[in-house]
Amino acid sequence: MFSINPLENLKLYISSRPPLVVFMISVSAMAIAFLTLGYFFKIKEIKSPEMAEDWNTFLLRFNDLDLCVSENETLKHLSNDTTTPESTMTVGQARSSTQPPQSLEESGPINISVAITLTLDPLKPFGGYSRNVTHLYSTILGHQIGLSGREAHEEINITFTLPAAWNADDCALHGHCEQAVFTACMTLTAAPGVFPVTVQPPHCIPDTYSNATLWYKIFTTARDANTKYAQDYNPFWCYKGAIGKVYHALNPKLTVVVPDDDRSLINLHLMHTSYFLFVMVITMFCYAVIKGRPSKLRQSNPEFCPEKVALADA
């Protein structure tokens, strides 16, 4: 009568075919990995690999800049009805333009204003200023914030509009030098190719951002991280001045993610692949339980050799 001993057959199969057992374990691990990865794609938003840079990564580049507000710089008085130069175009005008991309690239720089955190840290000794400062401006090149290619040589004009006038008299006269933190309106003026082409952050309006009655603008010198840690670094780079730092907090809405339809398709493919691998492993497992040790090995085993059995009987 035909009988199956599953446990014994499985032991014989494992002992007789170790490479195949290792293969089954590897396929099982791969199936579990695909299943886990598919579930991850289903529940998690994934940053799109097709978009190299979005506004989050672009604004984070400015975190590496040091801005020196020096006492030697002259203040420039501004009137409250100051408008953007005619040679620049706001981002709204650029987006509403019906010109082709080639014409837009040649139309000149555009302005984009975003709210950002700005800290001003007076150094000791600090010279101070004769007026309350409401605006800081600087000019950098693209390579200073890590841009490459043609954009590395593009000029980027930066203007910070403070919500209130910055008064440094307590530091200059009484030595009470405390760090000032502002949520400033940062206006970037540059060629359109410098900016990412993804969803933009909320805009601020520089002309109505400050509540000061008199506006004074001061030039700041920018220093990137490479210059800061270079061997020829000048320790007196911002002597008697204040160091300005920009901080951008990550905004998840600015990150370009893989669309839901694409994520569902990826999840479906991974599920199908993992199911196929599981079926293959289960099939091999069932074969091992039923078949046991291969017939060739069973015949070559001395216990089943008919010649030896006949000699033993003799």
From Swiss-Prot:
Pfam families registered for this protein in UniProt: TMEM219
Organism listed in the record: Mus musculus
Spans through the membrane: 21-41, 179-199, 236-258, 270-290
Region spans: Disordered: 78-106
Keywords annotated in UniProt: Membrane, Transmembrane, Transmembrane helix
Superkingdom, natural source: Eukaryota
Main location class: membrane
Protein name per the record: Transmembrane protein 248
Keyword Transmembrane helix among record annotations: yes
